[in-house]
Amino acid sequence: MKQYRKDSFIDAGSLPALKPILRSWIDVQLAYEHAMGHDDRAWSYRERTCVGFLSAAAWQCGGVTLEEWRTEKGPKKQTRHGRCDLYICRRNQEFFIEAKHMYSRATGRSERELTYIARQLDRAVGDASVLQCERSTQLGVLFVAPYYPAGKHPDSFDEHISEWLQGVATVPHSAMAWLYQPRHKLHGEQAMHISPGIVLLARTPK
């Protein structure tokens, strides 16, 4: 499908309130890359930094956030103290977010890699489900950074990334977005490790 060939894409799915935040999430990452002279990219980093860029995106589009804040988790009779990765409030819509980050070997066995991705998103959703807030405001988020190991570059990054994205889209989710370097510009020696972009998957608990 055509959308898998796009270098950036947003599908807010069942979470329309997330759409402007996801659009801003793409914008702030592009702004960072531009400020760094295209020598560094937001998706080069792990969970904590990825959460920070999502937080920045919410502020950029008129929301407010809290990061890594102390809260209570679990059933009220078995409350325990913990931390929530990110709270977003925008136009009276709240999201209490627990996030995970992972690298996915884009050239690995598709079935195995998709199982890993689904498992990590399940973990994020599970963590969100024990937050003491309304069920509809709980949100698990997974940041997935695909990578191509040295010596494993495809003949066509465009084709390969499109196929990889189609696979990732089969993982059950409520919303999805991604950002990639322009694929026609992707190149490098086979000895280089390449991480060309990032995917965000979000899902609410059942």
Language model feature labels by segment:
Residues 1-53, 57:
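Interdomain/boundary linker segments immediately adjacent to catalytic/signaling cores
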Residues 25, 29, 54-58, 62, ...:
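Hydrophobic, Leu/Ile/Phe/Ala-enriched alpha-helical segments that form helix-helix packing faces
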Residues 32-50, 64-66, 131-139, 177:
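Short glycine-rich, low-complexity/disordered patches
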Residues 47, 68-72, 98:
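Acidic-residue sensor for enzyme active/binding pockets
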Residues 85-105:
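Conserved catalytic cores of phosphodiester-cleaving nucleases, focusing on short active-site segments
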Residues 99-157:
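Catalytic cores of nucleic-acid endonucleases
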Residues 135-206:
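Glycine-rich, aromatic-bearing surface loops/beta-hairpins
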